[in-house]
Regions:
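Alpha-helical linker/hinge and terminal dimerization helices associated
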Residues: 17-20, 24, 28, 65, ...
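Pre-recognition alpha-helix immediately N-terminal to the DNA-recognition helix
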Residues: 16, 43-47, 107
Length: 153
């Protein structure tokens, strides 16, 4: 079997993606650092803020964040200590644990949100322009759909 190597343009697209994503993440991280929060913690707060009753089962939160259960536990330990979230057991099934956004966590997220949105606009959206944003959204939707199809198969 022979390897179907990437063409020059395919290699360029792939390398640009692989190198740009960490650069974007670093820029977003730097732009909210003054709020004493990491992007990882910010993402947790956002997911919880969008959930019913501002809480999610730990397994669902881990899936949403693409973290292992132990990775989520490590992520949440500091957030619990900071008072941004609380963990609680499900009253109907003690094996199920919830992460719940506290008022302090909501306030932390709301304080960082304007700087995060500005960072997303400056580093991600503005360089693309309106047409580029539309195209990129469609392209990533196609990739996401493909990944979901292959994972379900």
């Amino acid at each position: 079997m022979t390897t179907n190597w990437l063409s020059d343009i395919e290699q360029s697209a792939w390398r640009n993606f692989v190198t740009t994503v960490p650069d974007l993440e670093a820029a977003f991280e730097a732009d909210i650092a003054s709020h004493d929060i990491t992007m990882g913690d910010y993402k947790v707060l956002v997911f919880l803020s969008e959930a019913d009753d501002n809480r999610l089962r730990m397994c669902d939160l881990a899936d949403s964040l693409r973290l292992s259960p132990s990775g989520l536990t490590r992520r949440l330990d500091g957030m619990v200590k900071a008072g941004w979230i609380e963990r609680s057991a499900c009253s109907a099934d003690r094996r199920v644990m919830y992460a719940h956004l506290t008022d302090a966590g909501m306030n932390k997220m709301r304080a960082a949100a304007p700087d995060h949105v500005e960072s997303v606009r400056r580093h991600f959206l503005e360089p693309l322009g309106a047409k580029g944003v539309q195209q990129l959204s469609e392209l990533f939707s196609r990739i996401r759909h493909h990944l979901q199809q292959t994972q379900d198969a």
